[in-house]
């Protein structure tokens, strides 16, 4: 029963399919005929997996030592966590015929407009390891070219449309983004348990077509960008706990000063007794430690951004 409950990439629930059809007919004193036909369809696939985390060195005994923990904890996933694909299409056909409102026998010809959109979306989430995660997403928008005017030759129409579909349509825009997050295992080193570090890189790519009438002359426009972010946190309170003397000084609340003041009060009227020696060096050093080591946390962040835009680009991406 447990095996049957595991997600499979061929499970029926991973797929979805929709289709709709609508037709609008209108006419009035000015318009003899107005027909609008819309076909809409969508197909989607979503796979959510629970891949097993592989730890090849988990049972290696000599790696039990503290300074080898980062090797022992090495792990990876053999498959992506999530993959989705979705494609939608909208086919619009509009035919309009104006009414002849003159007394002359004027032949009125209908005007026809066609627009066939085709969108595709891809996403991928892959946890390469527990500390290394990769995300990717892409969207493509294209047009399926149809012969203009009324359909007079059905075979020619089908051939033109099928050739456009096989070429994934005439690409209009293509966008993709990816993100890589890494929790650096620096805290697994014994001397650096008090340090945590994360690194992240985000990248984008955009391709935009120019108008079809000037595309050969002006080309297309591409643009990309990259963002790198490095964040480091120093948990000094954890560091102090590893230094016993500093730990005691930081956590003390002036108890030592109270003990030193009590004998002075008892002997305030005794001018012949020897006054207790005051360790000014210790007082100064402890005070300095409290000031210096009173700082709990330090956070450091580094960020770098870059980008490029290039007009007049001729090639098209594979989408």
Predicted feature locations:
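Exposed, low-structure sequence patches enriched in small/polar residues
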Residues: 1-319
């Amino acid at each position: 029963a447990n095996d049957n409950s595991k997600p499979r990439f061929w499970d029926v629930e991973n797929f979805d399919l929709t289709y709709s059809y609508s037709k609008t007919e209108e006419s009035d004193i000015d318009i003899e005929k107005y027909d609008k036909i819309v076909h809409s369809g969508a197909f989607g696939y979503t796979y959510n997996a629970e891949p097993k985390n592989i730890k090849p060195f988990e049972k290696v005994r000599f790696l039990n030592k503290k300074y080898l923990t980062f090797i022992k904890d090495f792990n990876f996933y053999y498959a992506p966590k999530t993959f989705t694909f979705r494609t939608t299409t909208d086919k619009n056909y509009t035919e309009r015929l104006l009414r002849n409102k003159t007394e002359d026998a004027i032949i009125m010809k209908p005007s026809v407009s066609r627009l066939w959109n085709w969108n595709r979306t891809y996403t991928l989430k892959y946890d390469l390891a527990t500390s290394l995660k990769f995300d990717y997403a892409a969207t493509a928008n294209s047009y399926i070219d149809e012969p203009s005017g009324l359909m007079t030759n059905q075979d020619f129409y089908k051939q033109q449309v099928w050739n456009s579909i096989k070429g994934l349509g005439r690409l209009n825009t293509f966008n993709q983004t990816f993100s890589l997050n890494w929790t650096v295992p620096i805290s697994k080193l014994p001397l650096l348990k008090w340090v945590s570090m994360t690194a992240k890189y985000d990248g984008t790519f955009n391709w935009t077509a120019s108008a079809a009438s000037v595309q050969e002359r002006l080309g297309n426009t591409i643009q990309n960008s990259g963002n790198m972010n490095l964040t480091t946190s120093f948990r000094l309170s954890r560091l102090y706990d590893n230094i016993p003397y500093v730990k005691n000084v930081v956590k003390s609340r002036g108890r030592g000063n109270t003990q030193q003041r009590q004998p002075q009060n008892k002997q305030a009227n005794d001018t012949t007794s020897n006054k207790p020696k005051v360790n000014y060096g210790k007082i100064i050093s402890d005070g300095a430690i409290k000031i210096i080591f009173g700082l709990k946390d330090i956070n450091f962040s580094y960020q770098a951004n870059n980008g490029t835009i290039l007009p007049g680009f001729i090639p098209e991406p594979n989408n």
